[in-house]
Amino acid sequence: MGAYFGSKATSGLCQAIIALMPPHETYIESHLGGGAIMQRKPPALRNIGIDLSERALEQFQCAYPVERVHAHAHRFLADFDYQGRELVYCDPPYLHSTRSSERRYRFDYQEHDHLELLRVLKALRCPVILSGYPSRLYDEELSGWRSLELQVMNQAGVRTEKLWFNFTPDRVHWAAHAGRNHTHRQTIKRRAESWARRYAAMPPAERLAVLAGLMAVEAGE
């Protein structure tokens, strides 16, 4: 599926996006295309993929059930009945001004389409992650959002991808994806395994005390 123009199936990018995701029960991915993120992230209770291309929806494959929606992303997102435990990941066509390639999407975006999408995303009352190349337009429209830049490798070489998001990352939903990059993830994994071994070697009373202390931290006490 990496053949899709704009695919996120590039070195380190999928992991970084998934690691950023906060806890959620419903996952909505717009502009699904090849669905690189949907295919690689653990499933939510409900998973929804949106695309204007019927061909992309028909060809999309995933190890778990996904509701495939043939619709304009901004219309679906504006009309969806949000319950408070959703996460939206939005990967629209790159802005023309940021592209280094002449390749085009089957269903492309003009600037007014980007502005309409941003208007909808800003109004959503749930966590949103938006990806693209660094853009002054996005920075200005999403001035109150946080952002993160990543160096990734694609068919054209090394490019800078940018993520914009409307929440404060404070906990990782899936431990296997924790970390800024592969090296950081391996460091965290080794540290977690070391702490797990130490915890397993403790007497029951000490385990209980440590567990109570950790739960107090998570509760903000």
Question: What are these language model-derived features?
Answer:
Residues 1-221:
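Class I S-adenosyl-L-methionine-dependent methyltransferase catalytic core
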